[in-house]
Regions:
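Conserved acidic residues
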Residues: 37, 45, 67
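Catalytic-site signature of metal-activated, phosphate-bearing donor transferases
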Residues: 21-24, 50-167
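Structural hydrophobic-scaffold residues in regular secondary structure
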Residues: 1, 45-47, 160
């Protein structure tokens, strides 16, 4: 069916579920095939909401010399704190009506996300940080990294709605 759209998969891989290191390795491998193109990286339990049209954000990055755009997780949860069953007919906004910041305080899950980047920008496991010279760019250094958009902490931050239907 995908071939009918003129799309040929780069690679077909079968791995055990929740093998985050392998997922990140594949993201990086595929991105490096087009190092000067812009890539949106999103896991299948995430929906990214941009504060303005993505082409405007990328144009700003190209004009100002930024190479990656970051965001942060908004954890989604169902009524009474449940993780509801999801299938292809589910309206996820209806069954996950609540959002907040609870996974980090409860489990230490990293809330950062590198959402959009040039293909040559390597990302860490979980796509939480950009990696330069084999070092994760994080914390205050990451917030003010010269290649990061938005600079500092503020306008341009992408909302990453995290629907934990695989919990």
């Amino acid at each position: 069916q995908i071939e009918e759209l003129g799309i040929t998969p780069y690679k077909v891989v079968t791995e055990p579920k929740f093998h985050w290191e392998k997922v990140t390795e594949l993201y990086n491998e595929v991105k490096m095939t087009k190092p000067y193109d812009w890539w949106i990286v999103s896991d299948d339990d995430e929906i990214q909401i941009y504060p303005k049209p993505i082409y405007e954000m990328i144009d700003e990055c190209e004009t100002l010399g930024f190479e990656f755009i970051t965001g942060g997780f908004l954890d989604r949860i169902g009524e009474n704190g449940i993780f509801p069953f999801v299938d292809e007919t589910t309206n996820i906004w209806d069954v996950f009506p609540y959002s907040g910041f609870f996974r980090y305080p409860l489990s230490g899950a990293c809330p950062n996300k590198v959402c959009v980047m040039l293909g040559r920008v390597k990302i860490s496991n979980g796509q939480h940080y950009a990696v330069f010279d084999d070092k994760n760019v994080w914390g205050e250094e990451g917030a003010h990294h010269r290649l990061r958009y938005p600079p500092g902490r503020g306008e341009g931050f992408i909302q990453v709605h995290h629907f934990k239907w695989d919990s």
